Amino acid sequence: WLQTYRPEWQVHVTAMTGGLTSINAAGPRSRDLLNRLVDDVDLSPDAFPYFSVRTGTVAGVADCIIWRIGFTGELSYEVHVPSGYALHVWETLLATGEDLGVAPFGVEAQRILRLEKGHYIVGQDTDGLSKAPTAGLGGLVKLDKPDTVGLPELKHAYERTDLPVLVGVQPDDPMIVPEEASQIVDGETNTILGRITSSRMSPTLGRSVCLAQVDPSLAAPGTTITVLLGNGSRIPATVQQHHAHVDPEGARQRV
């Protein structure tokens, strides 16, 4: 981007991603675990709040990047380790946290947790028509800043009323999990008014949970929508107040 916007700067970009391995320590005891292996970073909530980053030593490995973020909705840290030391850090985390009940968790478990929390996957729950105000990110955008690259487009997005809106959806029958990409239709005309973008059965709630892109006319909480399933049947579902089905206040990840 800088090479096209400021060609006179002669910017060169070196990809560093391949030199780092990311390990996600998540759960109510994740801070306890990292405190045993990190001695040069204060992990207390006040010193290291949610959505912040530090650089420190983990399991004796220097220059690790520690983010207090995560995709699970729980207290969580992403630890980015120089790849040559990744196996050492991984094995040390498991051994050190044995009495805490530490265990590996897979991508499918992460995807269920993120959906319960309402975290969306870019490119699955969003698309080319998704904009900050319709994807639940309106509070992160400051339109009163001095002119910046992309500001006219952002302002235009806030003025539009025809863009699809990302919402949380709950099937009225909690045991039905609509297939992802199931169409949301007008019950009388079959006009397509949206689609289910993510869906899973929630072990936490014992029911299905979904995210969906819907026409603005259906985006208000409490609105009943019609979902067309792959077998041709239709089910009613209700638009929820939040994207998050679990802990919408974010209390778990901010402790």
Predicted regions and their residues:
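Conserved, structured C-terminal
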Residues: 1-255
